[in-house]
Amino acid sequence: MKDSELQIDRSCHVLYSKPCKKEILAKITLHYPEVEREVVWEQVQLRYTELLSRWRTDLGGKKNFHNGVGGTYDCIAIMCFYDVCRDVVTFREMEEIEENLILPSFRKLRFVDINKPFWKKLMYRAFSTAQKHCDTWHDYEMDVTPYENSKPIYYEFTACPAAEFAKRFGFADIMPALCNVDYASMELLHAKLVRTTTCVDGCRCDYTICGDKDSYVKEHPEYRDENGYRRNK
C-alpha cells in the first residue's frame, strides 16, 4: 500500500519518516520470504492507521520538532511493527531500529566533549531551549534543573507520549528497546547518562548527564534490569 493511501488525519498526525520505513522494511526482509514481505508491511501500515485513529490529536503534527525522525510517530510505527512481527523480531533488533534513526545525528557531534565546561554549558542551553518547545505543545512535559558548574546536568520528563501510547495499547514490554538509545547517544558526546526510572514504569523519566570522566559515573554503576532497561544504581 502506498503511504499516500493511508487513511490518517494529516491535519493533526504525521506519517512515519522515510528512514523509519526503511529500517522496518529491512527487518521484515530479514525475517520473511520475498512473497510475504509486502503483506507483512501492509499489516504494519494498517495497524499504524488503526491505532492513530484511536490516539490523541494534539501533538502538533509537522510543526512539532518531536515528530521528526526517531520521534513520537516513528516510535509508534516501530511499536506497530513489533505488534505484527513480535514472533520473529528480537529485542536487540528493535534497539537497532531506534539506534539507526537517532545515532547518526550524534555521530556528527563526536567532537563534543561534555567533560569540558564549554560543551557542558552548551548542552544545558540546548536542553533549556527544548523545554521551551515542550511548553508550547505540552506533549513531553519537561523540567530542566538550573545549571550548576560542579554538578551534572539534570532534567526530567513527567509526560511522554511514546510511553503513554505503549501503556495504552499494550507495548510497554518493548519500550526498553526504544529508551535505551538515550544512553548510546550520550556516549557519543563523551558523556554518560544516569537514569533510575522511566515514564513507562514510574512517574517520570530522569536524565542525569555528566562527562564520562566524572566520578559521579563510578558512584552510579549501570546495569540492565529484568525488563531490558539500561539503568543506574
Question: Positions of the model-derived regions?
Answer:
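Short, cationic low-complexity segments
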Residues: 184, 222-233
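N-terminal, charged low-complexity regulatory/assembly segments
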Residues: 1-82
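Short, charged/polar, Gly/Pro-enriched secondary-structure boundary elements
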Residues: 162-164, 212-219
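Short, hydrophobic/π-rich interface segment
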Residues: 141-201
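A short, structure-level motif marking secondary-structure boundaries and short turns
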Residues: 65-67, 166-169, 224-225
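Amphipathic interaction/junction segments at domain boundaries or subunit interfaces
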Residues: 70-168
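N-terminal functional module detector in eukaryotic proteins
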Residues: 206-208, 219, 225
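C-terminal edge-of-domain segments
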Residues: 196, 202-212
